[in-house]
Amino acid sequence: MNIFLVEDSQPVRERLAAMLGAIPGATVTGHADHAEPAIREILATHPDVVLLDLGLAGGTSGFDVLRAVRPQAPEIDFYMLSNFAADPYRQLAGRLGARGFFDKSREFERVREVIVQRAAAHAAAPV
């Protein structure tokens, strides 16, 4: 299962990549810290899962990525990950098609749990 990370903090991105890369069947295939290159790379590579930070470099957001990519690639599972986890952000993410929204400060390990489940389902799916 291929995962693309959209995260502007290098330490967080590295932590996510290490955590997710240790999951059997999961491979982090790319990353971006800004919406524009993220959109371009996601549409070019069609990963199975995209983890999106809300606030990105250059004043862009994960919502920009979700709005641009989701209609063109509805098969990709998007999950938001942010320190800004208030209900309005969670609700907007859901309306835009994100499958989940995680608070970085309290739900970081939950990301791993969800990806483990997703990788197991992906491995069991017929080709």
Regions flagged by a language model, labelled:
Residues 63-75:
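Short amphipathic alpha-helix used as the core "switch/output" element in two-component signaling
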Residues 88, 106-119:
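C-terminal output helix
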Residues 7:
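Conserved acidic carboxylate
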